[in-house]
Amino acid sequence: MTLAHIAEVCGGTYFGPEEKKTAEVTDIVTDSRKAGEGSLFVAIPGERVDGHKFIPNVASQGALAVISEQKLETPPCPYILVKDSMEAIKAMAEYYMQQLNIPVVGITGSVGKTSTKETIASVLAQKYRVLKTDANFNNELGLSLTVFRLREEDEMAVLEMGIDDFGQMHRLAKIARPETAVITNIGWCHLENLKTRDGILQAKTEIFDHLRENGHIIINGDDDKLSTVGTVHGIKPVHFGLDEKNEYYADEIESQGFRGISCRIHTPQGSFSALIPIPGRHMVYNALAGTAVGCMYGLTLEQIKQGIETLQSVSGRFHIIETGKYTVVDDCYNANPVSMKASLDVLKEAKGRKVAVLGDMGELGTDEAALHAEVGTHAGTCGIDALYCAGPLCEHLAKAAKEADSKLEVRHFADRESLMAELPKLLQDGDQILVKASHFMEYGKIVEMLETAQKL
């Protein structure tokens, strides 16, 4: 897009040499460190850092222009003055997506968005050139920046969309314009704003209002809330799950320990067996979602199987690390009651001393104490050997675990730092260690400590 075109799309005013108005931007960035020749830098006033202070830096790095909410007295490069930088970014992303018009698979749900996104992208990549959401770029800014990474040669986009309030999905889906909507499940996340699972269902299904003509809806048919979804805007949902009533279902499910989980997948086109190389029963659901999407877009069952079996784990998302001293399951990117219990169920399949290192789960609303206790009860009955946890809410978790199994070794610490100070003394060589907590607990620091244990 040219600077003149961008100014028009985002409703801004261009300031700079007339001849620069027809210059094409090479990329759009909000991180000043990534700005280079031909970049358009969007200055966003953040809570901690105001992007406007970096305008001189990006100009010296060769940026073509900047978008600013502030009038610049001595602009170091051409700029476009706007009322709201975030609104400008979203307007540009929405326009850019419309121009490309490539098929988009939009993924949402309470649990498993990222692992489902990775699975679907791995499947589709067996036939198409696929761009997928990086890391956790699933909010309005992250989605917009992902859209800007699309190029004409890309054949499909797999975009993750995360929300925590009503109306957010409308804004995300307006940008993404999905052709296919995939909803993984309706759990107990973001209850502070959405209040109930019915509220979560309402917020997630806002995505349906933005599906393209002749779109697809793919949902978890085993989920009691999603199973109530009927035909929407003339689109009949397709279901996946473990119940054979679903169009896509799985049986013969067997844990292969930390090697993964095997199953047989049934589709309207036939059946096949697969070894999913990431542990956990929840991964079967991800494979089923990937299978359904793959069939929608013309992949053979052999291509789908290949995509599933070559799937790779992502750091912080059940990523297995062999340190030489321990086996560490890095699942600390985020946590909620459903995913916490699922991860504990995988840990119990491990060979060796099974240790859960857990932390507080956030955004659970008024039921937070009860939900932590529920996870604690599960920890006390699922067959692990030790539970070490930290955080004020985990006090409820630890107490419930001990009540469920008085013989279970349980230690609770006030905070992560206290836990980290004692953890090396509590662990034994050969331990199989699950590390999981909500992102704000920063349990990645525990993983880093365990990774370096062999080098001490």
Identify the residue ranges that each predicted region occupies.
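Phosphate-binding loop of NTP-binding sites
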Residues: A7-E8, A88-H216, K225-H233, K425, ...
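Residue-level signal for inorganic ion chemistry
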Residues: I6, S39, V58, M92, ...
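Mobile, glycine- and charge-enriched loop segments
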Residues: K34-A43, V130, F148-M156, L344-G365
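Acidic, Mg2+-coordinating active-site environments of NTP-dependent enzymes
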Residues: V9-T13, S68, L72-P76, V182-V328, ...
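Active-site beta-alpha connecting loops in nucleotide-dependent enzymes
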Residues: R48, V314, C332, N336-D405, ...
